[in-house]
């Protein structure tokens, strides 16, 4: 999917180098850890790196510091450099919407929440009640449909409740936050993966213009999904990871911006941490015909859409109504 994005939207997606510093006591890293990480890098190349024509490199001490001179010199041993990709997510979404509208006749409307579902005499969904905001009187009206897709992210259970009458509690929201600090505090030439002390996670340190983004967290969230917030504990978590790997100290006073979001992870009884939950997506179809897509991530958006459309086609054909009326 990453290769497809690079091919289909080269103006929005570009290859991004990632550096994984290896630290050790007294400048020595355990041979087992070094060997395991090397195997992981080759595994990454075989499953994805070769598709974009980029393979990992092993860098020595001096080569590593050339990419990020603020790394802890007393603990740094060497590093691995591998390649992934980055995308302008907002422009990608707008581009897809423009293509759907201009090339395929889709009607695109934001600030138009779905407040209800209508069903025919057999209990099959045949309309969505919407309430456009900003029209003055917030008038409701019904959009007649042959199929309805519920792709509401962390709000999918709210839509399913309109359909099923009860909340299925199928989503486990996971909060992720990023902080922004001045680039001069970090001086990384590429994206860098740094470990979180006392945790089994790592975070990314990504340069962007005159700033550096640090993130993300991955924690359970039970607050209002309309307004996730970055807390002081979130900021401290990311700063501790950054300061563990660099010389000098970045403080809360250096943080010039934060943002927070929620991942609509599919709930699983087998995992205690959101970080351990699968990012795989799931497509469901209710008895009334509502098609719901949950889980997933931006990289696999095309595959998610393809699977969803396949389910929509099955729904329409099962009702024997066709796509022409």
Located regions from the model:
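General small-molecule cofactor/ligand-binding pocket signal
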Residues: 107-109, 256
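Short, surface-exposed charged micro-motifs
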Residues: 107, 116, 144, 202-204, ...
């Amino acid at each position: 999917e990453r290769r497809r994005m690079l091919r289909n939207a080269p103006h929005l997606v570009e290859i991004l180098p990632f550096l994984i510093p290896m630290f050790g006591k007294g400048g020595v890293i355990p041979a087992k850890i070094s060997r395991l990480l090397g195997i992981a890098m080759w595994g990454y190349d075989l499953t994805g790196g070769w598709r974009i024509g980029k393979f990992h490199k092993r860098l020595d001490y001096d080569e590593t510091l050339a990419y990020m001179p603020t790394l802890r010199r007393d603990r740094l041993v060497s590093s691995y450099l591998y390649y992934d990709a980055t995308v302008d997510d907002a422009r990608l979404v707008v581009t897809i919407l423009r293509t759907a509208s201009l090339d395929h006749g889709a009607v695109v409307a934001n600030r138009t929440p779905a407040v209800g579902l209508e069903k025919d005499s057999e209990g099959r969904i045949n309309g969505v009640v919407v309430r456009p905001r900003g029209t003055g009187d917030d008038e409701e009206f019904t959009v007649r449909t042959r199929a309805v897709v519920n792709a509401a992210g962390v709000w999918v259970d709210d839509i399913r409740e309109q359909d099923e009458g009860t909340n299925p509690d199928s989503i486990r929201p996971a909060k992720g936050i990023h902080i922004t600090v001045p680039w001069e505090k970090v001086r990384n030439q590429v994206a860098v993966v740094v470990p979180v002390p006392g945790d089994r996670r790592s975070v990314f340190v990504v340069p962007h213009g005159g700033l550096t983004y640090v993130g993300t967290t991955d924690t359970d969230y039970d607050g209002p999904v309309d307004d996730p917030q970055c807390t002081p504990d979130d900021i401290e978590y990311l700063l501790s990871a950054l300061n563990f790997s660099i010389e000098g100290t970045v403080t809360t006073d250096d943080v010039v911006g934060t943002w927070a979001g929620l991942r609509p992870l599919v709930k699983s009884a087998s995992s205690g941490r959101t970080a351990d939950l699968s990012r795989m997506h799931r497509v469901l179809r209710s008895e009334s015909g509502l098609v719901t897509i949950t889980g997933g991530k931006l990289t696999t958006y095309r595959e998610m859409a393809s699977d969803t459309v396949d389910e929509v086609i099955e729904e329409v054909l099962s009702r024997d109504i066709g796509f022409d009326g």
